[in-house]
Swiss-Prot record:
Keywords assigned: Metal-binding, Ribonucleoprotein, Ribosomal protein, RNA-binding, rRNA-binding, Zinc
Family of this protein: Belongs to the bacterial ribosomal protein bL31 family. Type A subfamily.
UniProt-listed PANTHER family: 50S RIBOSOMAL PROTEIN L31, CHLOROPLASTIC, LARGE RIBOSOMAL SUBUNIT PROTEIN BL31A
GN (gene name): rpmE
Quaternary context: Part of the 50S ribosomal subunit.
Cofactor comment: Binds 1 zinc ion per subunit.
Name of the protein in question: Large ribosomal subunit protein bL31
Record GO cellular component, one term: ribosome
Function per UniProt: Binds the 23S rRNA.
Residues the record lists as binding Zn(2+): 16, 18, 36, 39
Pfam families given in the database record: Ribosomal_L31 (PF01197)
Cofactor: Zn(2+)
């Protein structure tokens, strides 16, 4: 590797909005993240329900698409 052309690779602290922090390595001075393994719903087991039904209905209404018949 050539000398002097690569960025410095430092040990940093990554901070999450939930207050959790951990050490990592990066070329950046610091990293802030919105979610981490301590607060992400997949890891905590707390699932958030998304309002996708309202979005689908709004899409169908906007483009005049009839709802598909339900299979019985």
């Amino acid at each position: 590797m050539k000398e002097g052309i690569h960025p410095k690779y430092n040990e940093i602290i990554v901070k999450c909005l939930c207050g959790n922090s951990f050490e990592s390595r990066s070329t950046k001075a610091e990293i802030s993240t919105e979610v981490c393994s301590q607060c992400h719903p997949f890891y905590t087991g707390k699932q958030k329900l998304m309002d996708t039904a309202g979005r689908v209905e709004r899409f169908r209404k906007r483009y005049n698409i009839a709802a598909a018949p339900e299979e019985s």
